[in-house]
Amino acid sequence: MNIVVLISGNGSNLQAIIDACKTNKIKGTVRAVFSNKADAFGLERARQAGIATHTLIASAFDSREAYDRELIHEIDMYAPDVVVLAGFMRILSPAFVSHYAGRLLNIHPSLLPKYPGLHTHRQALENGDEEHGTSVHFVTDELDGGPVILQAKVPVFAGDSEDDITARVQTQEHAIYPLVISWFADGRLKMHENAAWLDGQRLPPQGYAADE
């Protein structure tokens, strides 16, 4: 299975995916990594793993649609079976989402539908939440609103900082994102009727781990 990963920053989830491919936990190969930031450390992670890297800077394009058209063109040179967003900090155009419908995954640092968008850890702290977490979902036109596949929960303790919660959530992200990608690679996971399906069973709104 051909995997293309899109990043904007450190690329810790990218590293987890690369490692899972190396150990055959994911039966696939990361063919290319794209970033909208030339200084994203994730590009160096990719280069160290011998993976092709590409940088597309938004300021070189006159619209989001033009950017996404070029991004589609370059991604499709790698014939991806799945496109994985791993901290890609751009809102994608409807044309991009439609082009990769059913094979476009994202990870979001909250227990969706709670806290779509930015600053999720801060919101969890400010609201006094006792648990927080992360969600892997299919991407649709609704921002962070596509069908949830799998969630992982973490506790929030008194005295926690944003950094504490970030570290706790990222540990879970590095476990569940490769797992979901492996389900996709094995043909177990699909999007159908705007819902996530695993092994032929429609998953509930909060995904596989909803009742855990």
UniProtKB/Swiss-Prot annotation:
Q: What is the effect of changing D144 to C/F/H/K/L/N/P/Q/R/T/V?
A: Loss of activity
Q: Write out the residues that bind (6R)-10-formyltetrahydrofolate.
A: R64, M89, R90, I91, L92, N106, T140, D141, E142, L143, D144
Instruction: Name the domain of life this protein comes from.
Output: Bacteria
Disulfide topology: none
What the entry lists under InterPro entries is as follows: Formyl_transf_N, Formyl_transf_N_sf, GART, GART_AS
A cellular component annotation (GO) from this entry? cytoplasm
What does the record say mutating E70A does? Answer: Loss of homodimerization. No effect on activity
Question: Might you name a Gene Ontology BP term for this protein?
Answer: 'de novo' IMP biosynthetic process
Keyword Ribonucleoprotein on entry: no
User: Residues that bind N(1)-(5-phospho-beta-D-ribosyl)glycinamide, according to the entry?
Assistant: G11, S12, N13, Q170, T171, Q172, E173
Query: What is the activity regulation entry?
Result: Inhibited by N10-(bromoacetyl)-5,8-dideazafolate.
Residues with site note (Raises pKa of active site His): D144
Q: Active-site positions, per UniProt?
A: H108
What pathway does this protein act in?
Answer: Purine metabolism; IMP biosynthesis via de novo pathway; N(2)-formyl-N(1)-(5-phospho-D-ribosyl)glycinamide from N(1)-(5-phospho-D-ribosyl)glycinamide (10-formyl THF route): step 1/1
**Which Pfam family, an example, fits this chain?**
Formyl_trans_N
pH effects: Optimum pH is 8.5.
The yes or no answer to whether the keyword DNA-binding is present is no
Gene3D superfamilies linked to this entry: Formyl transferase, N-terminal domain
Subunit structure as annotated in this protein's UniProt entry = Monomer. Homodimer below pH 6.8.
This one is known as Phosphoribosylglycinamide formyltransferase
What species is this protein from? Escherichia coli (strain K12)
This chain is encoded by the gene named purN
